[in-house]
Design a protein with these regions (language model features):
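Hydrophobic alpha-helical transmembrane segments of integral membrane proteins
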Residues: 13-14
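N-terminal signal peptide c-region/cleavage motif recognized by signal peptidases
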Residues: 17-19
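Structured, acidic catalytic/metal-binding patches in enzyme active sites
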Residues: 23-233, 237
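Bacterial N-terminal signal peptides that target proteins for export
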Residues: 1-9
């Protein structure tokens, strides 16, 4: 679940607010008998957000199959994975931080409205605590993962009896974070703590970029900082996955038909995007 991406959910989830006349970007890859649409999604959004537009609707109607990041993101599966891979009762989180960092974590937990406050965070591994700190205030502000674009697309295509296929599994996505070295995990948590007060401003900038269909702005606001400050995280969360998905698209081009691929908008922005990875293997993705 790409909603487990860090730099806080703010940097990679690209949340969508109430918006009118939004035109998120859409790309297409074609050969003689195959059409593949690429669409960037947001994973949390308020119930009254409207992101459909005619070109997007036509692409969805024409598509026979939907690919999303994962399909096994039901609450029971996610809860089991988080319990297995995200908790660490033997090593309290505050014991892994300096005294000043632990104090800031307590303050941020209360400010973000984390249920249970520091007691809840203290039994989490650093990656899960970082994600929790990022997600809690967004959910409190009315952002709902059940209303996310990917969820809506899955429901729409399922209702039309069209296949919905996952590019990854929930465990694969969670392990992107859970398998990181502890030092990288702690760096992620410290980044989330450091940037906590900037979240509202950055979120507003990201929203505007997504609504405008501006991948350069998405990269500038939401990805460039990770690329510069957390290069290992950037490679694992974005570059390696983008490369894998480009290879998957290349294989899908060998089969006739029309396919719609919806992944987090951050994967379709920046110098290492899916489109760039496709270009490296001789495949052009054209903006619609």
């Amino acid at each position: 679940m790409n909603r487990l991406l860090a730099r806080g959910a703010i940097a990679l989830l690209l949340l969508l607010p109430t918006a009118a006349l939004a035109d998120p970007a859409l790309w297409v890859v074609k050969d003689a008998d195959t059409t593949i649409y690429l669409f960037g999604t947001v994973h949390l959004m308020p119930k009254d957000a409207d992101w459909h537009y005619p070109m997007l609707n036509r692409a969805l109607a024409d598509s026979q199959t939907l690919y999303v990041e994962l399909t096994d993101d039901n609450p029971a599966n996610i809860a089991g994975l988080v319990l297995r891979l995200g908790m660490d009762t033997a090593h309290p989180l505050t014991s892994q931080l300096s005294e000043s960092e632990a104090q800031r974590l307590r303050l941020l937990a209360n400010k973000a409205g984390v249920p249970g406050g520091i007691q809840t965070l203290n039994i989490m591994r650093p990656w899960l605590a970082a994600l929790t700190l990022s997600l809690a205030p967004l959910k409190n502000a009315g952002m709902d993962p059940e209303q996310g674009v990917d969820k809506q697309l899955k429901g729409q295509m399922t209702a039309q009896h069209k296949p919905v296929i996952g590019l990854e599994t929930a465990e694969q996505q969670i392990r992107l974070l859970a398998d990181m070295p502890r030092a990288v995990e702690l760096g992620l948590l410290r980044s989330s703590m450091r940037d906590a007060d900037k979240g509202t401003i950055k979120l507003g900038q990201m929203i505007a970029a997504w609504q405008a269909g501006d991948p350069d702005a998405i990269d500038r606001v939401g990805i460039a900082e990770m690329r510069a400050q957390e290069p290992k995280l950037y490679q694992v969360m974005l570059v390696q996955r983008n490369q894998a998905w480009a290879a998957k698209i290349a294989s899908l081009l060998q089969q006739p038909g029309t396919i719609f691929i919806a992944v987090g908008a951050a994967h379709l922005a920046g110098p290492d995007s899916v489109q760039v990875q496709l270009r490296k293997i001789g495949i052009d993705a054209v903006r619609e």
